[in-house]
Structure formats: C-alpha cells, structure tokens
Amino acid sequence: MKAYQRQFIEFALEKGVLKFGEFTLKSGRVSPYFFNAGLFNTGRDLARLGRFYAEALVDAGIDYDVLFGPAYKGIPIATTTAVALADHHDIDMPYCFNRKEVKTHGEGGSLVGSDLEGRIMLVDDVITAGTAIRESMEIIKANGADLAGVLVAIDRQEKGKGELSAIQEVERDFGCAVISIVSLGDVVTYLSEQDGMDAHLAAVKSYRAEYGV
C-alpha cells in the first residue's frame, strides 16, 4: 500500500465516509463496513479528495484525453480531479459531465464542459452494480469516443450476483481497466496495522471470505 492510499483511508475515517459496524446493503448482505463518499461535503474535503483521485490517475499511467463525471456524484469528482491534476501535477486535462435532463435552450444538449472525444477516463465514487457505467457508455459511444478506463474511490472486491465483482464485470464487458484509490485489501492491511481494530478486522476478513473475489 502506497502512502497516498494509507492517507486516503485515514481521511475517509476522519470524515465518517468509511465506517465499521453492521450495515445492510441494497443486496441484502450485512456488511461490516460502509463507504459514503457524499460525506466529503466541504470545499476543503473536495480539494483533498481531488488530490487523491489525481494521484491514483498518475500512478496508474493510463493514457486518456478527457475526464468524464457521470451525473450526479461524478460531477464534483471530475471537477476537483481536473483542478488537482492542474495544480499538483501540471496536467491541464479537459473535463466533461452529463445532465440527467436534456437542456433545450441556451447551449442545449446533455453534456457540459469539454467535448467528449478521444479516450475517456470516467471518474465516480464507487461501482455497485455497474449501471451508471453502462449508461455512461451509451453517452460516450454516441459521441464517437472510447472508454479508456474507470477510476473509483474504493474497490469492494466483492462478488455480484455471479462469481465476478461489479468492477470485474465492467472490465470484462467494456475491455477497459478499472482502477481505485484503495481496495478492500488495502483496508484490511490498514486495519491489521492499527491497535484496537481486531474486531473490525476479523469481521471484514470473515465477510471477504464469504463474498470476496
């Protein structure tokens, strides 16, 4: 685990974005942890979040031309990532996001920002079922662009309905890399390094043994 990944886990814990306990997911599974990126909800939080996304992008070394943030959660993520790339890595990357509702006046259309062209890096908070990615793919294809990759905050490394995780299904279906700032494996490593986290570590390991990929 790299320094920025450890710092991201600490940041998520500090802000209550990453919590340990018992949480019933939409799937009905009872998870020993929960990740709610919506709690990164101040200007300072968003600025820090962008730096972690930018760090993960630079670390991954994937070639792309435009950042795309799917509405709604992806919009501030794409924006802050673009700012962080410019401020901290001297990479001036165009960004774009979509509207859920097509605008019929003014500039019109469903896209805001840069043209959606070339190789697209999609940024979002998490991939749960891959639905948002599939919807975004329709937009990307309709503009004649290609999906270069997907970046999310955390990879739960958890089976979906079959044997693959939602992220593995996206990689299989769209032939692109899906990268994350951290994975569940990184969270396990972090917990194992902390004093007083044995109960949470045991619960996460047990959950991973049952549902992990």
From Swiss-Prot:
Keyword Nucleotide-binding part of the UniProt annotation: no
Cofactor: Mg(2+)
Domain of life: Bacteria
Pfam families given in the database record: Pribosyltran (PF00156)
EC class of the enzyme, as a word: transferase
One example of a Gene Ontology biological process annotation: 'de novo' UMP biosynthetic process
GO cellular component, one term: cytoplasm
Membrane-crossing residue ranges in chain numbering: none
Binding locations of orotate: 34-35, 128, 156
Binding site for 5-phospho-alpha-D-ribose 1-diphosphate: 26, 72-73, 99-100, 103, 105, 124-132
GO MF assignments: magnesium ion binding; orotate phosphoribosyltransferase activity
Family stated for the protein in its record: Belongs to the purine/pyrimidine phosphoribosyltransferase family. PyrE subfamily.
Role summary: Catalyzes the transfer of a ribosyl phosphate group from 5-phosphoribose 1-diphosphate to orotate, leading to the formation of orotidine monophosphate (OMP).
Quaternary context: Homodimer.
Protein known as: Orotate phosphoribosyltransferase
Taxonomic lineage from the root: Bacteria, Pseudomonadati, Pseudomonadota, Gammaproteobacteria, Vibrionales
